[in-house]
Amino acid sequence: MTRPILVVCLAGALALTGCADSSPRDGGGGPVTVVFKHAKLLGPVDPLAPLLVEFAALHPEIRVRAEALPWSSDEQRQFLVINLEGGNPGFDVMMLDCIWVPEFARAGWLLDLTPFLPPGELAAHFPSAAEAARYRGRDWALPWMMNVGLLYYRADLLARHGLRPPETYDELVAAIRRIRAAEGNPRLEGYLWQGKQYEGLVVNVLEGLWAAGTRVLGDDGRVFPDPERAEAVLRFLRGLITEGLSPPWTTAADEEITRRAFGQGEAIFLRSWPYAADLFELPDSPVRGKVGLAPLPRHATGTAGAGSTGGAHLGVARGTRHPEAAITLARFLTSERAQRVMAESGAVKPTRPALYHDPALVRAFPSLPRIHDLTLAGRPRPVTPAYVILSTTLQPELSAALVGVKTPAETVAHSRRRLEFLLEGLGG
């Protein structure tokens, strides 16, 4: 998830966010400049600009320079790590994939926010989002936007052929074959998902493992604790491509490539995030009024499918020279007011459950209550400081299985050996 460059003057909304008594104090008397690193928000409009203007009008004593991070999450993390490791990163507030919080906190790169937050402040957010902001009982970040993996489907095509949204992957495959045979459209793809070698591929595989009733890390720390089921998941994903149920370019596909193809009416099913829902309903969208939402399916060996929950948090660099201003900015952008503005833009979904049932927002975005329920049913990626090592080790192995360079059995065996060695060296 990633965003356009804004350079705006901002200010610390202490009164608005209620942190006047609990914020750390900056020294000096003149305006301070806070550098905010964020990624481009994917949606119909960018909500940051009006929020930053509002913030600047309230508090002209703080100047905020908002700067865009690279496009992909892997490149974002690389940029942040390189700069944070030097101890003088050149930015104060950063947008974080929530899965990075334990790693960044353990490395000493984040300011511990616990002393500066009123008790219970994180209780207004989804429990999974609040938990992702914590490490070893301390609060290291503030939840900003929420994500969950969803199944999008062409409701018009399913209705035309007397089908319901699939609850299993066997039903999804059968629906693709039935609809394509009846439609006679050689350009109509079946199931779009993210198979490029990056974090998105790991997420898709994690969801496949959950759908099969297994996971990547066992309670005892074993990698792929049920190797046979893991191999079956990889065979299924590879088979989607080789059997033409997913396009051959799946192995180079990310969120935007798949979202655009589905949005042009070129596929029956899509695995993606909530941001896509509002883009499909734009006035000029070829699929407007034709798209439904459902949970991700399950495999025959599983009891239920589950989308990966995630999203973005805001953290404050431990080396900031302006902690009061930085925390004020982070609290403003994650406040109920700011999350409402962001939700109204259609760019992102909030981390505050109450907004999913707000009458005005539901009128504008009828899918919100459904997304709320699917978010509650989702599952987080493994919460561990070693997650990035887990992900970066898995990415080439999983990609090799998808393109047929390795068999699923080889991928699972090689991944287990490498990861168990690395994780043991890190103490898990």
Region roles according to the model:
Residues 135-136, 140-144, 149, 173-222, ...:
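Extracytoplasmic/periplasmic solute-binding protein
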Residues 98-148, 173, 189, 201-204, ...:
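Hinge/lid segment of periplasmic solute-binding proteins
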Residues 81-83, 89-92, 120-157, 189, ...:
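A structural signal for short loop-to-beta-strand junctions that line the ligand-binding cleft
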Residues 92-95, 268-273:
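Paired acidic/hydrophobic, glycine-rich loop segments that form the ligand-binding mouth/hinge
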Residues 68-79, 99, 169-174, 249-263:
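Short helix-initiation/N-cap motifs at beta->coil->alpha
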Residues 176-180, 220-251, 296:
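Glycine-centered hinge/linker elements that transmit conformational signals in sensory
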Residues 273-288, 297-396, 426:
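C-terminal lobe and pocket-closing loops
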Residues 4-102, 121, 285, 300-301, ...:
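Conserved N-terminal structural module of periplasmic/extracytoplasmic solute-binding proteins
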